[in-house]
A protein has these predicted regions:
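N-terminal Sec-pathway targeting helices
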Residues: 1-14
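Interaction-surface signature
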Residues: 27-61, 146-237
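A structural signal for well-ordered alpha-helical scaffolds and beta->alpha junctions
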Residues: 14, 18, 120-124, 145, ...
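Membrane/wall-proximal cationic-aromatic binding patches
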Residues: 29-130, 227-230, 236-237
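Membrane-interface motif at the C-terminal end of an N-terminal transmembrane signal
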Residues: 14-33
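A conserved hydrophobic secondary-structure block that centers on an alpha-helix together
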Residues: 128-149, 154-157
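Conserved beta-strand elements of the Class I
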Residues: 103-107, 136, 164-166
């Protein structure tokens, strides 16, 4: 009887240790492997410091995020450091070309914005040289085609041009069924956005539900609506 009790105690200890090791391993791997979703990922805590920086440089209540006028950023990739600047009109600085007439405007995501190159290395900069015009770059990283179109609608009123270029890559299209980027790009917890959807064969707009800075602290109150309109929630979470 004594041996049986000892065996049961030993087996219980082993099972507890295995469970603790599994929990520890899952939490470690979860930080690097975005496809491993655990309970804390359902309602992640938003960094106060990160939000403060996001509000000053990138938050937009309608579009979700934007490159704000008169902001700049440096980014390192390997041994290369690149810099970008946004001018007072809200598009990427086009240096000496800004004095030229504007006939072309560009909208889209980071491929349009030309991330990881300097202001004098963007394809809009070279297109400006080829056309002898000021090609305005309104691209924003992580945008879906929906956000690019809404940005076009906003900017075209005061930045009319003869030609508009919409930059599209596969992810630009995938993002149109996303409402919270965290569900599509794990960890992108500040990225709440609008999206279009079809209702009775008509195109309708689901507006950005986190449309004020104060709503970030209580974003969980809107999770049901967000999840209902986010295609990737059901696929990943």
């Amino acid at each position: 009887m004594f041996d049986l009790v000892n065996c049961l105690i030993f087996a219980s200890v082993i099972l507890i240790l295995i469970e603790l090791i599994a929990i520890f391993t899952v939490n470690i791997v979860n930080k690097k492997f975005q496809w491993l979703i655990i309970s804390k990922d359902q309602i992640p805590k938003l960094s106060d410091g990160g939000l403060k920086k996001f509000f000053s440089h990138g938050y937009d209540p309608v579009l979700g995020w934007i490159r704000k006028p008169n902001t700049s950023h440096s980014e390192q990739s390997g041994n290369k450091i690149t810099n970008w600047n946004i001018n007072s009109q809200g598009y990427r600085t086009n240096l000496e070309n800004e004095s030229l007439p504007n006939k072309i405007s560009c909208f889209g995501d980071s491929f349009t914005f030309a991330r990881q190159v300097n202001d004098n290395e963007t394809w809009e900069y070279y297109l400006s040289k080829l056309t002898n015009t000021n090609v305005k770059n309104f691209g924003v990283g992580n945008y879906g085609l929906d956000q690019a179109l809404l940005r076009l609608k906003r900017e075209f009123i005061k930045n009319k041009s003869e030609l508009v270029i919409l930059g599209v890559v596969p992810d630009t299209i995938s993002r149109i069924v996303s409402v919270w980027k965290h569900y599509y790009e794990y960890g992108n917890t500040f990225g709440f956005k609008p999206r279009f959807y079809l209702k009775n064969n008509e195109l309708c707009l689901f507006k950005n539900i986190i449309n004020s800075e104060s709503k970030f602290s209580n974003y969980h109150l809107n999770l049901n609506k967000i999840q209902n309109f986010d295609f990737f929630y059901s696929k990943k979470f």
